[in-house]
A protein has these predicted regions:
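Internal low-complexity, small-residue/proline-rich segments
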Residues: 1-253
């Protein structure tokens, strides 16, 4: 059912509440637990937080839509294997870090950003619908009309007004166990620490690595190496590093 109707099985509530230090970046002073009201009848739950996000791929085309197979590692019912990393394991991002939500939802005038936008998601489902097949359909709200492919997120930012950091568990990194994209997934659409905010629609969206480290964010690659992706990385290169089978020629980064 809809994300807001999904609640923890009582047996697993202690696990949902658990704070796991290895899932938290020491440089992020954000909350380590969040409260969210879910289900019908509504109940309040506590979630342990998370800084490390698995990649759904480049975010280009329809590869932001984790309901279907993507050019990354993770999607609903994903069955990606190491042999599917045709771009090479050392050239493919598997996970990257993010900044946890600040636990304060706000509604602001269109085009206005909150004081710390990197701690919130721009909740931009207005003007979109699931449509058929991979990818969502736009009909307003700054989104292109028709299938949403490679959208101009600044146009979306200019129209949308809702910023989320915890409502219904819908904040960045508010849980490590609830499998919603804005909580546990990332993609390469936005470069590290981009001034374009992480933008979500219907539980999925357009994200990017974020950290409070100076100059960039860390990423885990398919070969197990951890490398620092600079804020200044070329956007095309960044997206290529997040795809596992795009056939791109990737130089030094």
């Amino acid at each position: 059912g809809p994300g807001g109707s999904q609640v923890p099985n009582p047996v697993f509530i202690p696990a949902f509440q658990a704070v796991i230090p290895s899932f938290l970046c020491p440089s992020d002073p954000g909350p380590v637990q969040y409260m969210a009201t879910l289900g019908s009848p509504a109940q309040t739950y506590i979630f342990g937080a998370n800084n490390y996000m698995a990649s759904t791929g480049s975010g280009t085309g329809t590869n932001y839509d984790d309901r279907s197979s993507t050019d990354g590692f993770v999607a609903i019912n994903s069955s990606v294997r190491f042999k599917d990393m045709r771009d090479g394991s050392s050239q493919t991002v598997f996970m990257s870090e993010a900044i946890r939500g600040d636990d304060a939802d706000v509604t602001l005038p269109a085009g206005t950003t909150p004081l710390f936008p990197y701690r919130k998601l721009l909740s931009a489902g207005s003007g979109t619908s699931p449509g058929s097949g991979p990818g969502y359909t736009g009909s307003g709200g700054g989104w292109p009309t028709g299938k949403i492919i490679n959208p101009d997120l600044l146009a979306v930012l200019a129209v949308q007004t809702n910023w989320r950091a915890t409502a219904g568990g819908n904040g960045r990194g508010v849980t490590w166990l609830r499998g919603l994209a804005h909580s546990v997934l990332t993609n390469g659409y936005n470069t590290p620490n981009s001034r374009i905010p992480d933008t979500t629609l219907h539980g999925t969206g357009f994200f990017g690595p974020r950290s409070l480290h100076a100059g960039g964010a860390h990423a885990l690659f398919g070969d197990g190496s951890v490398r620092f992706l600079a804020d200044s990385i070329d956007v095309g290169l960044h997206r290529a590093l997040h795809s596992r089978d795009g056939g791109e020629t990737v130089g030094e980064f």
